């Protein structure tokens, strides 16, 4: 029975139908207001794996597949910027085994994304690694910098991979840069304003954050993009784990966003 249901799900006629439905939904949503900057807090990989009695690594791997699927749909819709909270600085407090495992997944994921030419090249994605890069293992850092270098000339869309990241670190880094500029005489205290502060953030030259989505039912931002959230940012807390986040759950959120942002 399991083999039969698996065949049915992956059979060509059904897959063709799903592809047609996806195209129809994308074309419909594109007629309305599409958020230009979407951020994801990808929470619940470990709990998703435990719920299914799987290894933790399987949860994180499935989470990466969900990100790829959603990223592709975002690009098809014309979203210009996607920010993904892939690893918090706080995650270094986990066991060495899990940290090493997450680093390996991140390295492999970045390699896959940059090697996946039909995604990166077709949609002109520029990858930015945003976070405290000094904490990365040498081989992971090398892969991250390579992804940035390979895609630096792309201008159609931006993927901010927040890894390892917290807003507190980002804000502290901006303050340190401004203090150094003042000490060097590059700026005076009177020059310091919001624009100077934003120009020294790790996530700089970004579009306003339109939509922030967090999975797993937890209703907090967990130190993610606190400066970038503004009065018009819509924040959605959804009650399922990240690996279960399919495009079919994403489409209704975008339609709801459009209904809530109709011209007066």
Swiss-Prot record:
Q: Which InterPro entries match?
A: UPP_synth-like, UPP_synth-like_CS, UPP_synth-like_sf
Disulfide bridge positions per record: none
This protein's pathway = Protein modification; protein glycosylation
One annotated GO biological process: protein glycosylation
Which Gene Ontology cellular component terms are annotated?
dehydrodolichyl diphosphate synthase complex; endoplasmic reticulum; endoplasmic reticulum membrane; lipid droplet; membrane
List, separated by semicolons, the cofactors it needs: Mg(2+)
- Which top EC class applies here? transferase
Q: Where in the cell is it found?
A: Endoplasmic reticulum membrane
Catalytic activity of the protein: n isopentenyl diphosphate + (2E,6E)-farnesyl diphosphate = a di-trans,poly-cis-polyprenyl diphosphate + n diphosphate
Known EC number: 2.5.1.87
Keywords from UniProt, A to Z, are: Endoplasmic reticulum, Magnesium, Membrane, Transferase
Which molecular function terms from Gene Ontology are attached? Answer: ditrans,polycis-polyprenyl diphosphate synthase [(2E,6E)-farnesyl diphosphate specific] activity
Q: How does it sit in the membrane?
A: Peripheral membrane protein
PANTHER family according to UniProt? DEHYDRODOLICHYL DIPHOSPHATE SYNTHASE COMPLEX SUBUNIT DHDDS (PTHR10291:SF43), DEHYDRODOLICHYL DIPHOSPHATE SYNTHASE FAMILY MEMBER (PTHR10291)
Subunit info here reads: Forms an active dehydrodolichyl diphosphate synthase complex with nus1.
Family, according to the entry, reads as follows: Belongs to the UPP synthase family.
Purpose: With nus1, forms the dehydrodolichyl diphosphate synthase (DDS) complex, an essential component of the dolichol monophosphate (Dol-P) biosynthetic machinery. Adds multiple copies of isopentenyl pyrophosphate (IPP) to farnesyl pyrophosphate (FPP) to produce dehydrodolichyl diphosphate (Dedol-PP), a precursor of dolichol which is utilized as a sugar carrier in protein glycosylation in the endoplasmic reticulum (ER).
Q: What is this protein called?
A: Dehydrodolichyl diphosphate synthase complex subunit SPAC4D7.04c
- What is the scientific name of the source organism? Schizosaccharomyces pombe (strain 972 / ATCC 24843) (Fission yeast)
Q: What taxonomic classification does the UniProt entry list for its organism?
A: Eukaryota, Fungi, Dikarya, Ascomycota, Taphrinomycotina
């Amino acid at each position: 029975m399991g083999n039969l249901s698996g065949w049915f799900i992956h059979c060509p006629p059904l897959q063709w139908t799903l592809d047609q439905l996806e195209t129809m939904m994308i074309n419909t949503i594109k007629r309305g207001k599409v958020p230009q900057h979407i951020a994801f807090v990808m929470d619940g990989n470990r709990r998703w794996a435990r719920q299914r009695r799987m290894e933790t690594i399987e949860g994180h791997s499935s989470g990466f597949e969900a990100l790829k699927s959603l990223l592709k749909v975002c690009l098809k819709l014309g979203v210009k910027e996607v920010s993904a909270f892939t690893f918090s600085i706080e995650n270094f407090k986990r066991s060495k085994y899990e940290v090493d495992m997450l680093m390996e997944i991140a390295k492999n994921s970045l390699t896959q994304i940059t090697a996946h030419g039909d995604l990166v090249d077709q949609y002109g994605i520029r990858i930015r690694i945003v976070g405290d890069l000094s904490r990365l293992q040498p081989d992971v850092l090398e892969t991250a910098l390579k992804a940035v270098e390979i895609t630096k000339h792309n201008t159609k869309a931006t993927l901010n991979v927040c890894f390892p990241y917290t807003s507190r670190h980002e804000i502290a880094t901006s303050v340190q840069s401004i203090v150094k500029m003042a000490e060097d005489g590059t700026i005076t205290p009177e020059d310091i304003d919001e624009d100077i502060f934003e120009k020294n953030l790790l996530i700089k030259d970004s579009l306003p954050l339109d939509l922030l989505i967090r999975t797993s039912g937890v209703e907090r931002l967990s130190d993610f993009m606190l400066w970038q959230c503004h009065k018009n940012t819509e924040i959605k807390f959804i009650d399922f784990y990240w690996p279960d986040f399919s495009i079919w759950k994403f489409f209704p959120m975008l339609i709801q966003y459009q209904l809530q942002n109709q011209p007066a």
